[in-house]
Amino acid sequence: MSEPLNLHRLTTESRNSQTVEIHKANTLGILKMINNEDMKVAAAVQEVLPDIKTAVDCAYESFQNGGRLIYTGAGTSGRLGVMDAVECPPTYSVSPDQVIGIMAGGPEAFLQAAEGIEDSEEAGAEDLRNIQLTSNDTVIAIAASGRTPYAAGALRYARKVGAHTIALTCNENSAISKDADHSIEVVVGPEAITGSTRMKAATAHKMILNMISTAVMVKIGKVYENLMVDVNVSNKKLKERAISIIQSLTNASYDTARYTLEQADHHVKTAIVMLKTSTDQKQAQTLLDEANGFIDKAIEHYHP
């Protein structure tokens, strides 16, 4: 006979005293109760900023050593990792292999729940084995409960390989935190609907993943001022955004910005350096290469 999981001991599974009569509320009352709970999320995230910093530093070190940032999780947790990972290539022109989201059950589970797989530690390890995990990588295992076997298996395997390991959960002193080098335990309190961790827990985790990937991209030079200067110009909307970015940083006219972007092979950074230094595409690209992709350093290094 299997032992009970004792989920009632977890904060994420506790009943919320503020919403016990949500079933009696009218539509606006229901929404107010949910909104009141959601307002607690940002404050909870603020409490764990030092732990988030550690995760950013690990990912940055991995990138510097040719490694990757890998999110892994089951159910909603896995979907959050995939969502963050797939936005990095269009936003920052990084390779799809640099930030990876792995979900228990594979891509099919994103659209149709495959809940049973979360109980397999071996599946968590196997999915990392399949992408040839190395000691240069950073693995962030996401599990609101902090006890999901799939996440635990992933962390244990990653630790054995020598990768940086981080547990992201919503319960203090969680089981998977013991399997990781570092942990981010963002305690958002009981959910408006008991145990529905797709609500506050998922919101907190989405915020944290946004912060981690964004901060790392800033640190590797993908952002100048507060503009996404490495945006992948892959459609009309992004081309217009790229032109606007170039105009904002160089005071060029629309036509000049568009022409220079085209001359720069639609590489925004190169176009900016071309206009800032009055160089051609080849010279500007060389300056950027010598500056490891940082626009300000490329401009500083230029000597006419």
Curated annotation (Swiss-Prot):
<feature type="active site">
    <location>
        <position position="118"/>
    </location>
</feature>
<dbReference type="GO" id="GO:0016803">
    <property type="term" value="F:ether hydrolase activity"/>
</dbReference>
<dbReference type="GO" id="GO:0046348">
    <property type="term" value="P:amino sugar catabolic process"/>
</dbReference>
<keyword id="KW-0119">Carbohydrate metabolism</keyword>
<comment type="function">
    <text>Specifically catalyzes the cleavage of the D-lactyl ether substituent of MurNAc 6-phosphate, producing GlcNAc 6-phosphate and D-lactate.</text>
</comment>
<dbReference type="InterPro" id="IPR001347">
    <property type="entry name" value="SIS_dom"/>
</dbReference>
<comment type="similarity">
    <text>Belongs to the GCKR-like family. MurNAc-6-P etherase subfamily.</text>
</comment>
<dbReference type="GO" id="GO:0016835">
    <property type="term" value="F:carbon-oxygen lyase activity"/>
</dbReference>
<dbReference type="InterPro" id="IPR046348">
    <property type="entry name" value="SIS_dom_sf"/>
</dbReference>
<keyword id="KW-0456">Lyase</keyword>
<dbReference type="GO" id="GO:0097367">
    <property type="term" value="F:carbohydrate derivative binding"/>
</dbReference>
<dbReference type="GO" id="GO:0009254">
    <property type="term" value="P:peptidoglycan turnover"/>
</dbReference>
<keyword id="KW-0597">Phosphoprotein</keyword>
<feature type="domain" description="SIS">
    <location>
        <begin position="59"/>
        <end position="222"/>
    </location>
</feature>
<dbReference type="InterPro" id="IPR005488">
    <property type="entry name" value="Etherase_MurQ"/>
</dbReference>
<dbReference type="Pfam" id="PF22645">
    <property type="entry name" value="GKRP_SIS_N"/>
</dbReference>
<dbReference type="InterPro" id="IPR040190">
    <property type="entry name" value="MURQ/GCKR"/>
</dbReference>
<protein>
    <recommendedName>
        <fullName>N-acetylmuramic acid 6-phosphate etherase</fullName>
        <ecNumber>4.2.1.126</ecNumber>
    </recommendedName>
</protein>
<dbReference type="Pfam" id="PF20741">
    <property type="entry name" value="GKRP-like_C"/>
</dbReference>
<feature type="modified residue" description="Phosphoserine">
    <location>
        <position position="2"/>
    </location>
</feature>
<dbReference type="GO" id="GO:0097173">
    <property type="term" value="P:N-acetylmuramic acid catabolic process"/>
</dbReference>
<comment type="pathway">
    <text>Amino-sugar metabolism; N-acetylmuramate degradation.</text>
</comment>
<feature type="active site" description="Proton donor">
    <location>
        <position position="87"/>
    </location>
</feature>
<comment type="subunit">
    <text>Homodimer.</text>
</comment>
<dbReference type="InterPro" id="IPR005486">
    <property type="entry name" value="Glucokinase_regulatory_CS"/>
</dbReference>
